[in-house]
Amino acid sequence: MRSSKGGRGRQAAPKTAPTTVCYCDGKRELGSVEVVCSTCLKWFHGRCLKEFHELNSNGVPFMICYTFTCKQCRPTAEDWKAKKADLVQMCVTVLATLSAERLKADGKLSAEHVPEDFTYLSLKDEIVPYMNENWYMLTAIKQKKEWHQNLAPTLLKEKNIFVQHNDDDDLFALAEKNLSLLGPLHEAVKLIGKRPIERENREPRHIELPPIEGPKTRGASKRRHAEAPVTGKKQKLAADYSSTAAPNGVQIDIPFSKDNYRYYLTEVDPNVPEDPAWNQNQSSAYVIPSFHYRELLNPTVNVSSNDRAFQLSINGNSITGFEGYSMARASHGVSKGTWYFEVNFDDQPDDSHIRIGWSQSYASLQACVGYNKFSYGWRSKHGTKFHEAKGKKYHFGGFKQGDVLGCLIHLPVDKKLQIPANLPSEKYLPVSHKGFNLISFKANYFFEVQEESADIAKTLVEMPGSYIEFFHNGKSCGKAYENIYAGAYYPSISIFKSATATMNLGPKFRNLPRGATGIHARADEQQHEQTLSDMLYLVSKEVNLDHPPRVKREDDDDVKDIKKEIKQEI
């Protein structure tokens, strides 16, 4: 007969937090190094630890990535096991530390009294600088140069831990106002990185495979095993490439743009002669010069198949979101003139929002329009406008499902020359990617463009007379931004949660403002400008073209004179 004491049939009594603190029977000291025992749930001061007293100087307040057992629960000695903190866990520690400093300065820091309001902190001015200065005190993970680029979207995904200010995207706070509860045993902390319940309840993915017929050989058992559907495995939510139709109609796979890397489908440039040194039958490796290829542009303007966040669902020019804010851009951009596109707000489930506007290709796709210097946006909630994560009042009431929104950008040009005044051609012509790496991916060639957005942000200059204007159901809301940074801007939309919106890129608009051109007309114009940009690149880099010497012809001198004139014009 099973004993009534212990055994499987008896549930363990839930742990309750003790009322005393530390070996010294003192009080909590928020803002200093403290650790909690995973067995008795008692908090201990870093200075009072027996075997690990060095934590008082080497540790940081509000650490959450460790397991500690006190000497009262483990008589032989204290036990300490540190765990590697990821970005979200680091942010919990940093926000708690900075919040404690703010509350202490205001005379409100106490373990007995919980603040009524959230303690908001600036991501740009407080959180990121603190993490940069104390990185290796917070984690053993190697610090990357652009680690903070996607910090805001990362925090937004952990809704049980962080809250964002309604009117300022740069301000974040801890959802837990009682700092005395923060530690490795906090329920929200324990769920960091765990998959949401709705993902856990997804139906297992079954893959239908055709029956394998043939004689019973040694490999038959392996083939039978391959026929069985795979269940229970976690599906990879991220993706590395998108499948789409190329301009020539062929279905291809194209890598997603992400983390300062962008990819452009190419074709052989018919204006560049083949290298006579190349022999397709040679056994040694041959590196194809990238200038032998050119970017293959879409004949029409549409939502880009790869210059978008991977988690967005694209159907034609309709975009549906997933979880936190993420962005999609159009396939063509503008750097001069007055251009216009519209957005139809198709579906707005509860607590979902969108932002629309214009962004440069350097703007992060895992963030919202208006998150940094490279984008300007307008939010459906409250009608707030955003730039550099700073929200300002713009159009009272915002917009909602069923509304038609217009986006206009004006980048002034010289009336006679029809180009921006006092700007070199490389500032308004599309970039020639002939000087970038040429890579092979899924049987196609792509230009791989890698540029540090942080470095480019330092070189931005305002364009006098430029502006962005938004329209609500055909009526102007006024100029939202003036004297914006010069650069190439793309129609952009970012979606929060599962809202759906459609980009209307022309040629039929509900309301085309006077003097503006529909963005659809940019397709033909960019074809010509891209060709000119490539020609200028070839002329300026001619000395690097590695072709063998040829026999001089009578017209060589005339050709040299023409090329010399072109260089002088450049």
Swiss-Prot record:
It is found in: Nucleus. Its main location: nucleus. The keyword Transcription applies. A zinc finger (PHD-type) spans 19-76. The lineage of its organism: Eukaryota, Metazoa, Ecdysozoa, Nematoda, Chromadorea. The keyword Hydrolase does not apply. It comes from the Eukaryota. It comes from Caenorhabditis elegans. PROSITE patterns: B302_SPRY, ZF_PHD_1. GO terms for cellular component: nucleus; Set1C/COMPASS complex. Expressed in somatic and germline tissues (at protein level). Residues 201-242 are annotated as: Disordered. This is Set1/Ash2 histone methyltransferase complex subunit ash-2. Disruption phenotype: Decreased levels of tri- and dimethylated 'Lys-4' of histone H3 in the somatic cells in embryos and young adult animals. Increased dimethylated 'Lys-4' of histone H3 in primordial germ cells. Decreased dimethylated 'Lys-4' of histone H3 in the distal region of the germline. Reduced fertility. RNAi-mediated knockdown results in the extension of lifespan. Decreased levels of trimethylated 'Lys-4' of histone H3 in L3 stage larvae. Leads to a deregulation of fat metabolism and to an accumulation of mono-unsaturated fatty acids in the intestine. Component of the set-2/ash-2 histone methyltransferase (HMT) complex. Required for the di- and trimethylation at 'Lys-4' of histone H3, a mark associated with epigenetic transcriptional activation. Implicated in the epigenetic inheritance of lifespan over several generations. Functions as a transcriptional regulator. Acts in the germline to limit the longevity of the soma, probably by regulating a lipid metabolism pathway that signals from the germline to the intestine, thereby preventing accumulation of mono-unsaturated fatty acids. It holds the Pfam family SPRY.
